[in-house]
Amino acid sequence: MNIVILAAGMGKRMYSDLPKVLHPVAGRPMLAHVLDTARALSPSRLVVVVGHGAARVREAVAADDVAFAEQAQQLGTGHAVMQALPLLDDNQPTLVLYGDVPLTSAATLQALVAEAGAQRFGVLTVEMPDPTGYGRIVRDAAGSIVRIVEQKDATEAEKAIREINTGIIVCPTGHLRKWLSTLRNDNAQGEYYLTDTVERAVADGVETVSAQPAAVWETLGVNSKLQLAEVERIHQGNQARRLLEAGVTLLDPARIDVRGELTCGRDVTIDVGCVFEGRVHLEDGVRIGAHCVIRNSTVGAGAQVHPFCHIDEAKVGPAGRIGPYARLRPGTELGEDVHIGNFVEVKNAQVAAHSKANHLAYVGDATVGSRVNIGAGTITCNYDGVNKHRTVIEDDVFIGSDTQLVAPVTVRRGATLGAGTTLTKEAPADKLTLSRAKQLTIDAWQRPVKQPKQ
């Protein structure tokens, strides 16, 4: 099967320099969602018709399995499909999709393709409570589709029809090539309508059939930021429903955003306002507090992530305690029962089991052993202005508050660093190491007093 995706429109009502099909739904361009659905049908040829912002669209979706055709002038949907004809295989039917209709399911498209087979003309239709603005499906007395009439060209009787054309069609490619060559633009829009091919099919004796989606929202197109927001909420509602049906507890299903793939074990609880990006896996018994952002990460069984944490390309071990207000940056790997507390940032560091950094610390480019206590205000000074250097902290180390570890440096097993230490050399095992300026008291000192204003 050939699949053609129309993605040439300007999207004037978006009021944006970004091509319409690149506006995101769930953090990904609408066109990327349509391509994913198209690939699920295993097409032999996949063609994207580009126009406005063609270079940006090509760059955004470039892939070995995608060919591009360019519609230099936007003269209608029929004209757009004409541009793809040289890239299509006449021996297989062609399915036409739209880059700004991101929620259509593969199951719905498979039903349409099955209904049409190899020789019939298939149209995806849906009944709308308010069909204003959509092309109407006109049927004869026997119920057969005879044509599709656009809103601006419809009579009052035709405007009363509630069954509308979604724009998604499938038909024999050889016939499509012939029908497109006969299209005219003598209509209110001055465009070449793809929908006019239905009348050509009827005239040529090609049976026209229809299929319907499981839900109306599958066929919603996006032409404005308002419609984009509506589609986003529908998609997020679908994601929330999937999680609930899988046994996840969502404290408010209307306040979760999944911008990628979220998988969960048993007895997972997610509080309000959380955002999940990329691939995220939450193991059994995980609890995620309110307003966390988690991206491309794994959270181990029984771990608790308290409110307002950011976790990016990191691994949290089983029974971990994160936050509130903690930040785990890429390359962070935490072992079992590791505690990362409020206003602690960890980057490109491996922290072994039962270690803790509970307050106000930066642990970057470090290897931290087991049962280590990192005191409040501890900083690994990893950057010399050109290169990053590593800090190694071995098992059972105790680091006092307000300590700076100037990398590269190693703290040996069982060492204790006194509060306020600036460590520039190796700290030996099982000893107290500290560096501290001599404390002075100046007896004759007086605090300055502000002079009264003149």
UniProtKB/Swiss-Prot annotation:
Pathway(s) the chain acts in: Nucleotide-sugar biosynthesis; UDP-N-acetyl-alpha-D-glucosamine biosynthesis; N-acetyl-alpha-D-glucosamine 1-phosphate from alpha-D-glucosamine 6-phosphate (route II): step 2/2; Nucleotide-sugar biosynthesis; UDP-N-acetyl-alpha-D-glucosamine biosynthesis; UDP-N-acetyl-alpha-D-glucosamine from N-acetyl-alpha-D-glucosamine 1-phosphate: step 1/1; Bacterial outer membrane biogenesis; LPS lipid A biosynthesis
Ligand binding (Mg(2+)): 100, 223
Pfam families (UniProt xref): Hexapep_2, NTP_transf_3
Binding-site residues for UDP-N-acetyl-alpha-D-glucosamine, renumbered to this chain: 6-9, 20, 71, 76-77, 98-100, 135, 150, 165, 223, 329, 347, 362, 373
EC top class, as a word: transferase
Any Gene Ontology biological process: UDP-N-acetylglucosamine biosynthetic process
Active-site residue numbers: 359 (proton acceptor)
Residue segments, region N-acetyltransferase: 247-454
Cofactor names: Mg(2+)
Annotated spans, Pyrophosphorylase: 1-225
Binding site for acetyl-CoA: 376, 382-383, 401, 419, 436
An example Gene Ontology CC term for this record: cytoplasm
Disulphides: none
Cross-referenced InterPro entries: Bifunctional_GlmU, GlmU-like, GlmU_C_LbH, Hexapep, MobA-like_NTP_Trfase, Nucleotide-diphossugar_trans, Trimer_LpxA-like_sf
Annotated cofactor note: Binds 1 Mg(2+) ion per subunit.
Subcellular location: Cytoplasm
Catalytic activity: alpha-D-glucosamine 1-phosphate + acetyl-CoA = N-acetyl-alpha-D-glucosamine 1-phosphate + CoA + H(+); N-acetyl-alpha-D-glucosamine 1-phosphate + UTP + H(+) = UDP-N-acetyl-alpha-D-glucosamine + diphosphate
Region (Linker): 226-246
Primary localization class, coarse: cytoplasm
Keyword terms: Acyltransferase, Cell shape, Cell wall biogenesis/degradation, Cytoplasm, Magnesium, Metal-binding, Multifunctional enzyme, Nucleotidyltransferase, Peptidoglycan synthesis, Repeat, Transferase
GO molecular function, one term: magnesium ion binding
Cross-referenced HAMAP family: GlmU
Family, per entry: In the N-terminal section; belongs to the N-acetylglucosamine-1-phosphate uridyltransferase family. In the C-terminal section; belongs to the transferase hexapeptide repeat family.
Described function: Catalyzes the last two sequential reactions in the de novo biosynthetic pathway for UDP-N-acetylglucosamine (UDP-GlcNAc). The C-terminal domain catalyzes the transfer of acetyl group from acetyl coenzyme A to glucosamine-1-phosphate (GlcN-1-P) to produce N-acetylglucosamine-1-phosphate (GlcNAc-1-P), which is converted into UDP-GlcNAc by the transfer of uridine 5-monophosphate (from uridine 5-triphosphate), a reaction catalyzed by the N-terminal domain.
Subunit structure and binding partners: Homotrimer.
Protein name stated in the entry: Bifunctional protein GlmU
Native organism: Cupriavidus taiwanensis (strain DSM 17343 / BCRC 17206 / CCUG 44338 / CIP 107171 / LMG 19424 / R1) (Ralstonia taiwanensis (strain LMG 19424))
